[in-house]
Amino acid sequence: MTYSLRIADLPSNERPRERLIACGSQSLSTAELIAILLGTGQGKGKLSAVGLGQYILNQLSQYERDPLSILRNITVQELTQIHGIGTAKATTILAAIELGKRVFQSRPPELAVVESPQAAADALSQDLMWQTQEKFAVLLLDVKNRLLGTQVITIGTATETLAHPREIFGEVIRQGASRVIISHNHPSGNVEPSPEDINLTKQLLAGAQILDIPLLDHIIIGNGEHSSLRQITNLWEDYPQRG
């Protein structure tokens, strides 16, 4: 794709809107998605909307970070410092980013059945995803694995003990839940469990056996990713849970 051509001058199979309709939004590059938001480029003889989208990403790459991670929290003032981006284009980009955040963070309806690690991560994303502080939360379920609610138990840092079994199961009992999924976030984005994560999970699985409140999983959430300790460890074989 030539970035200096107007989008109208491109072959139809290279135009972002037409490609989105024909192939789906996931097939577009980040620059093409931005181009759809921009609508127009810098003007005659200059960058097209796609070229301007790529130029924005290139400018943000100068900070030696993923451009998308910078876009997530960018301001109108920062965007309008980029040549070719005025207030109208900047506010359109920010509105799209905020809408994407809200869609991503939306919780499933109450009493939705949580049947997979992905469903659990979706339910907890508003509390734990993209957070700069480490948080520990519980997903409260009834006997049929229907979602009763979520609760952040503690907020701390990676060097602190985030949660004690007494706090976790105390909340489960207070809320009248029959089953529980625990979760915490890694602000670094790395969702591999640490030795401390493994040890805490062992303690909680043992406590769940004593209290007869099945602990179904421990989900670690990062920047758009998650991992299930039930899937990647043998802990549930060592500490089997009822049901």
Curated annotation (Swiss-Prot):
One of its GO terms (molecular function) is metallopeptidase activity. PANTHER family: DNA REPAIR PROTEIN RADC, UPF0758 PROTEIN YEES-RELATED. It comes from Trichodesmium erythraeum (strain IMS101). The keyword Metal-binding applies. Belongs to the UPF0758 family. Zn(2+) binds at H184, H186, D197. Keywords: Hydrolase, Metal-binding, Metalloprotease, Protease, Zinc. InterPro entries: MPN (IPR037518), RadC_JAB (IPR025657), UPF0758 (IPR001405), UPF0758_CS (IPR020891), UPF0758_N (IPR046778). This is UPF0758 protein Tery_2667. The keyword Metal-binding applies. Residues 113-235 form the MPN domain. GO terms for biological process: proteolysis.
